[in-house]
Amino acid sequence: MAIKPRTKGKTYSSRSVGSQWFNRLGFKQNKYGTCKFLSIITAFVFILYFFSNRFYPISRSAGASYSPSHGLYINEIPASSRLIYPHVEHVPVLKQMTVRGLYITRLEVDGSKRLILKPEENALTDEEKKKTTDQILLVKHSFLDHGKLVYRKSNDAPEVVVVTLIDFENYELETIIQIVQNRVDYAQKHQYGVYIRWIQEFLPVLENQNLAESYEFIKPLVIRAAMHAFPTAKYIHFVDQDALLMNLDLSLQKYLLDPKIMDLALLKNVPVVANSNIKTYNHFEYSSAKIIIPHDADGNIDASSFVIANDFYGKALIDYLNDPLLRNFPWDNTGDKLSAAIGHILQWHPTLLGKTAIVIPKVLASQYDASLDQEGESGNGASNGDVYHYNEGDLAASFKGCRSRGTCASEIGHMYQKIKKS
């Protein structure tokens, strides 16, 4: 038997139900009633929006709540010149003060003392400097405030910035002056920037604050600081303090960044590090080179002088090298730890290897050998044309290992005089 509806002739629609509800609220089913109803709804939504923004302002500005980027210090000082280097004449006073006298020290649970950096500390104003007669205080603030300098002039922005670390504890004033003047002379010839920092400025950032053990990993810290100080620079050229730029007439653009020159200097199909199964690529796009770094005579990465682009790939490498886990890893390497870390990432990340040009030492860091530097026809560091040792006309002379030999001051001084004579 078919089921019949209980009520005949009655139909229900959403329109009739809506109309009954509309009438119960006191609105007539005409044009005026509809407008009145919509006006009330609009007013309610507006009031809700107004009070939600008043009591919950974070929801309105969530996309713009990030603090401005900064380096080690929050408060920065605009630099008037693209040549940023410290007051080297303060070396005698800094030696007298020692590193402990420059920072606040904190006693740790294990009884050790750590140097502490105050990133929020303000720089000493010109008025305060004029009123201060304490020479020690002025030198201390000059040391601490130097890291706050940033260059933001867009009309005179350098394409390349030469970066170097200097050490007031282990080097004498004369040697430091020669190193700094060498970088300034080279940069001025090619309209480059200069970014030189005291090594001791970065000690509070390190977990291991022993300078001798952590020196290599201060290099990526100063490079990252240079990238921030010169945000529009295309390339950062790091040159170790144990090296001199010998041929001041060679610019990176015409010398190393030229594809024809790079093709001659590029090491193709060779192990990334000694005895590695991972090799450099046979086919390399020169225009995509973001990192240019030499091998040493043993076939390992030489981080004493290299060029890195101030872009995504360059910053990715530097941020990787600044990771505390990597910095404190017990690298099993006979050379320096930084070179081992760079070699590691290049072997395991083919994308980054494809952006890295590993070149012969001669183009960036020719090794100086005093035994080859004899006066006469074969003098001036002649090395029978090999690609490892310094010859007259090379861009740079590296004195790598001079600290262990105790010959840094004499070798730097000797070669610096040759630059001045040329």
From Swiss-Prot:
Q: Which InterPro entries match?
A: Glyco_trans_34, Nucleotide-diphossugar_trans
Listed GO molecular functions?
A: alpha-1,6-mannosyltransferase activity
Q: Which UniProt keywords apply?
A: Glycosyltransferase, Golgi apparatus, Membrane, Signal-anchor, Transferase, Transmembrane, Transmembrane helix
Q: Which domain of life is it from?
A: Eukaryota
Q: What class of enzyme is it?
A: transferase
Cytoplasmic topology ranges:
1-31
For this protein, the Enzyme Commission number is 2.4.1.-
Stated membrane topology is: Single-pass type II membrane protein
Side of membrane Lumenal, spans: 53-422
Q: Where are the transmembrane segments?
A: 32-52
Q: Where in the cell is it found?
A: Golgi apparatus, cis-Golgi network membrane
Tell me one GO biological process term.
protein glycosylation
Instruction: Fetch the Pfam families from UniProt.
Output: Glyco_transf_34 (PF05637)
Which GO cellular component terms are attached? Answer: endoplasmic reticulum; Golgi membrane; mannan polymerase complex
Gene3D superfamilies of this UniProt entry?
Spore Coat Polysaccharide Biosynthesis Protein SpsA, Chain A
Q: Which family does it belong to?
A: Belongs to the glycosyltransferase 34 family.
What extra comment accompanies this record? Present with 3480 molecules/cell in log phase SD medium.
**What is the role of the protein in this entry?**
Required for synthesis of full-length mannan chains.
Annotated PANTHER family = ALPHA-1,6-MANNOSYLTRANSFERASE MNN11-RELATED (PTHR31306:SF10)
Q: How does it assemble?
A: Component of the M-Pol II complex composed of ANP1, MNN9, MNN10, MNN11 and HOC1.
Kindly provide the name given to this protein in its UniProt entry. Answer: Probable alpha-1,6-mannosyltransferase MNN11
Tell me the organism: Saccharomyces cerevisiae (strain ATCC 204508 / S288c) (Baker's yeast)
